[in-house]
Amino acid sequence: MDPVVHLRAAVCLLGRFPALAGIDLDVEAGQVVLLRGPNGAGKTTLLRAVAGLVPVVRGEATVLGIDLRRDRKAVRRHVALLGHATGLYDDLTIAENVRFWAQAARSTAEPAVAMDRAGIDARTRDLAVGRLSAGQRRRASLAALLVRDARIWLLDEPHAGLDAVGRDLLDALVRDAAGAGVTILLASHELERATPLVDREVIVAGGHTEALHVA
């Protein structure tokens, strides 16, 4: 079976400069892979490249068999990115944002179920995102991720902004999703938190994948 994510000598540019300069990575369906490395190593750029948001200019790059160099838009239909930017509209309520993402992804997932799974109570759902605390915004982003029913999750420092209860909830969601066959790439500096969730770890440094460790 072909890997869900396949990168071989993949190069990405930010402006004229290489942000990723020869990435090699294969990820199978249902695997959870931790990307670790120092700030500026290229972890976020790698996630954005897999999401089809940053072009791969050289090398091999396929996601779900789709050539990233030819059709990034087709890839975006199948991935959900949880990053530093929330992807939410401040003037809309949580519920309105989650419904928007369900429609944008043409998903059949129920927004109410996604909000339940993200631990968002009924009263909070009607608050505008611009009025939320950092933790509430993160849960809203989680609900938007869940409702897209994506085959690949790309999580950039996903525990950031969550309290202890929210962190436990996120861990459970990752385990459940992987058990259901969702492929997950997770970038984190919180190694003690993230390592128990993953199948293996990839070191990213200087725009390269330097080492692969079996967790």
Identify the residue ranges that each predicted region occupies.
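Helix-to-loop junction immediately C-terminal to a conserved catalytic motif
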Residues: 51
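Catalytic Walker B motif of ABC-type/P-loop ATPase nucleotide-binding domains
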Residues: 153-157
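The feature captures the beta-strand-to-loop junction immediately N-terminal to the Walker
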Residues: 36-38
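Conserved ABC transporter NBD signature motif
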Residues: 59-70, 75
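ABC ATPase C-loop
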Residues: 145-146
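H-loop/switch region of ABC-family ATPase nucleotide-binding domains
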Residues: 187-189
